[in-house]
Amino acid sequence: MNLYTVIFINILLSLTLILVAFWLPQMNLYSEKANPYECGFDPTSSARLPFSMKFFLVAITFLLFDLEIALLLPLPWAIQTIKTSTMMIMAFILVTILSLGLAYEWTQKGLEWTE
């Protein structure tokens, strides 16, 4: 199989699954489905508590930087490649992007917990 056939099959399968996912579900909204569930009992307090947006932004920032660090984990194995200079340039670019993102978050006070 050549590469174009594999790509075409992947795109076709993806589009088919997306279309089936949109057509299959029947959106029957019941009031019971919208109510919060707390271990079979009626909730003791409101389930719609305010959520700290600052916590959400710090959590998203952590996930982004954690993903970038996970991209650096294969570097020890990549050093064994034939094109070591290309690997080092790509690693340097990735670390630079990570550092610029951290500097931007720091200057915008995105890492400050209190305001």
From Swiss-Prot:
What sections of the sequence does the record tag as coiled-coil?
Answer: none
> What is the main EC category here?
translocase
Compartment(s) where it occurs, according to its Swiss-Prot or TrEMBL record: Mitochondrion inner membrane
User: Where does this protein chiefly localize?
Assistant: mitochondrion
Which BP terms in the Gene Ontology apply to this protein?
A: aerobic respiration; cellular response to glucocorticoid stimulus; mitochondrial electron transport, NADH to ubiquinone; proton motive force-driven mitochondrial ATP synthesis; response to light intensity; response to oxidative stress
Keyword Ubl conjugation attached: no
**GO CC term, one of those recorded:** mitochondrial inner membrane
- Give the EC number(s) under which this enzyme is classified: 7.1.1.2
GO molecular function per UniProt? NADH dehydrogenase (ubiquinone) activity
Q: Does the keyword Methyltransferase apply?
A: no
From the UniProt record, list the reaction(s) this protein catalyses. Answer: a ubiquinone + NADH + 5 H(+)(in) = a ubiquinol + NAD(+) + 4 H(+)(out)
Q: What's in the keyword line of the UniProt record?
A: Electron transport, Membrane, Mitochondrion, Mitochondrion inner membrane, NAD, Respiratory chain, Translocase, Transmembrane, Transmembrane helix, Transport, Ubiquinone
Q: Provide the topology term for how it sits in the membrane.
A: Multi-pass membrane protein
Q: Which residues cross the membrane?
A: 3-23, 55-75, 86-106
Quaternary organization: Core subunit of respiratory chain NADH dehydrogenase (Complex I) which is composed of 45 different subunits. Interacts with TMEM186. Interacts with TMEM242.
Report the family membership.
Belongs to the complex I subunit 3 family.
Function description: Core subunit of the mitochondrial membrane respiratory chain NADH dehydrogenase (Complex I) which catalyzes electron transfer from NADH through the respiratory chain, using ubiquinone as an electron acceptor. Essential for the catalytic activity of complex I.
Q: What is the name listed in the Swiss-Prot or TrEMBL entry for this protein?
A: NADH-ubiquinone oxidoreductase chain 3
What is the scientific name of the source organism? Mus musculus
Q: What is the lineage of its organism?
A: Eukaryota, Metazoa, Chordata, Craniata, Vertebrata
